[in-house]
């Protein structure tokens, strides 16, 4: 089964984008349109007629008369090999990972039927720092460079950078600093675009529950305007039912002593 398209429909498009428009899925891990098209993961490899080597679909432009095969045995084997190499440097302890069930790497492993790992697994080891709202686990980083590009090209903050060389290449905070020593605004764009659990938002649930259980502590909630809107989506309830009164009642039922609305506070 094949698909043909007029050159005008896909002119100046990358193969990955053109295939997506035609309803043909091509797996990818590092690609972000016009932001990160560096073919770092090599998961989007395709076979092009009259070309000896496989080509990355994310940064190979469509040309008139080009015949592209996206699901040949050679292509599938290359993708499996590349994914296994990525997994050989990845902490695959998925059962305790916050991204389990919502992880692009995990989904790719299922889609490509990866059931065994022939390569030695040696994930990077580093201390997990919980001093800031954004937490990085280096052992789960797949070097896709999404965080680097999003922070540079969209946010303009240049917090993340590439460190090391060769097989020791990794992503780290620029100039070897800690995150709290940078100008990071903790906007969360790097977390949103990370395909794995390498970058996550710090979970303070246990600390909150301990505070609620401590009779000597007075607990206060400050609600920002955005929270009043977003909590309905998080709780999967209709917006019309997610009233401010209902949210406050829920927080008081949990045991919080005071609930303040930041939009009503005048300084």
Model-derived segments and spans:
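Fe-S ferredoxin-like electron-transfer domains
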Residues: 42-186, 192, 199-200, 204-218
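Short, contiguous strand/loop micro-motifs
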Residues: 5, 134-135, 177-178, 233-236
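Conserved adenylation A10 loop of the ANL superfamily
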Residues: 151, 266-267
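Short Gly/charged-rich anion-binding patches and loops
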Residues: 6, 14-15, 104, 136, ...
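Short alpha-helix boundary/capping motifs
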Residues: 1, 9, 141, 184, ...
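Short glycine-centered, acidic/aromatic-flanked micro-motifs in structured strand/loop junctions
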Residues: 5, 173, 223-225
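Iron-sulfur-associated redox domains of electron-transfer enzymes in respiratory
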Residues: 12-77, 87, 202-265
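Single conserved hydrophobic/aromatic residue that forms the stacking wall/gate
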Residues: 1-7, 11, 265-266
């Amino acid at each position: 089964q094949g698909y043909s398209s007029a050159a005008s429909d896909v002119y100046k498009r990358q193969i990955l984008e053109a295939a997506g428009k035609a309803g043909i899925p091509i797996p990818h891990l590092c690609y972000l349109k016009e932001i990160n098209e560096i073919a770092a993961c090599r998961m989007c490899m395709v076979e092009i007629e009259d070309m000896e080597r496989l080509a990355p679909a994310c940064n190979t432009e469509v040309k008139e008369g080009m015949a592209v095969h996206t699901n040949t045995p050679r292509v599938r084997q290359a993708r499996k090999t590349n994914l296994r190499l990525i997994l050989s440097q990845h902490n695959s302890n998925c059962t305790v990972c916050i991204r389990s069930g919502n992880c692009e790497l995990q989904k790719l492993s299922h889609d490509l039927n990866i059931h065994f790992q022939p390569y030695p697994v040696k994930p990077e080891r580093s201390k997990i720092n919980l001093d800031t709202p954004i937490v990085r686990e280096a052992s789960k980083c797949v070097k896709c460079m999404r965080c680097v590009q999003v922070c540079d090209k969209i946010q303009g903050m240049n917090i993340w950078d590439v460190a090391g060389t060769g097989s020791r290449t990794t992503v780290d905070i620029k100039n070897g600093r800690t995150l709290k020593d940078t100008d990071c605004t903790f906007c969360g764009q790097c977390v949103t675009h990370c395909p794995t659990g390498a970058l996550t938002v710090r979970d303070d649930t246990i600390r909150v529950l301990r505070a609620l259980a401590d009779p000597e502590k007075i607990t206060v909630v400050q609600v920002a305007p955005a929270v009043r809107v977003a909590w309905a989506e998080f709780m999967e309830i209709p917006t019309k039912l997610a009233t401010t009164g209902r949210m406050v009642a829920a927080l008081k039922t949990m045991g919080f002593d005071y609930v303040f609305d930041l939009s009503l506070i005048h300084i």
